[in-house]
C-alpha cells in the first residue's frame, strides 16, 4: 500500500505519515494512529492497544520522556519500540551494541564524539543515563530475547582505554550467561559477508509486524516495517550469523582479548 493510499480520506498528511513511519515523529492525536492502523488492517483490540501504548509512551508517559528533548531525532520513538519489543536481532560492525555496554564504555564513546557533535558534559551524562536505563530490558520480568552479532572490529576498536575495554569484555562475558541473550562474534579473518552499518530487527509477537531500525548520519533513528526491508535485513542477519563463530566460542574469544589488550 502506498503512502497516498494509506492517508487518503484521513486527517493525516503524507509527510506526517512518512515521518511517523520512519520513527522521526509521532501522531499528536491517538485517534489518528487508530485510523491509520485500521487502514493498514490492524484491528485486533490487543494489538491496537499495544501500539497505542507504545505511541503514548513515546510522546509523554515512558521513562524516556524525561530525556526526549536531548535525544536525537526519532530516538525517543525508537526507545519506546525497544522497550515494548519481545525479541531483537542486532548487528554491530564498529562499536559494542549499546545494550551490552558498560557505563564507562558509554561515557568514553560519547566523550570521543564531543568535538564532532558539539555536545556538553551534561548531555553526555544524560546520554549515559538513558543507555543504562535501556539495559534494564535485559533483566526485567519477561526480559527481551536478544540475539547479537558483534564484529571483531567492534571489540578491538579501543574506546576510552585498555582498562575500559577489559571491563567491557568482562561485561559481555557476564551478559552472555543470561538465558535470554545469544552473543556471537564475527572474526576479522573469516572470509564472509559483512554489512557496513549496524541494524536492529525488532519483533513484537506473531500478530504485529517486525520492524528494522538503522541509525542515521546525525545520530537519529530510522525505523520501517516495509516487507521488502524486513526481508532484506533478515537475510543479512542470517548470513552474518552463519559466518560468525558458534555461540559457545564467545567467552574464549573475549577472554583472549582481555589478555591481549
Features from the language model and the residues they span:
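Short glycine/serine/threonine/alanine-rich loop segments
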Residues: 1, 12, 181
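Interdomain hinge/linker segments and adjacent boundary elements that couple functional modules
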Residues: 3-9, 22, 26-156, 225, ...
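Key DNA-contact positions within bacterial/archaeal DNA-binding proteins
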Residues: 4, 14-15
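Short Asp/Glu-rich motifs
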Residues: 15, 56, 195
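Short acidic (Asp/Glu) and glycine-rich catalytic loops that position anionic groups and cofactors
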Residues: 16, 30-34, 211-216
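Base-recognition residues in the alpha-helical recognition helix of bacterial helix-turn-helix
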Residues: 19
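C-terminal regulatory/effector modules of DNA-binding transcriptional regulators
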Residues: 142, 149, 156-261
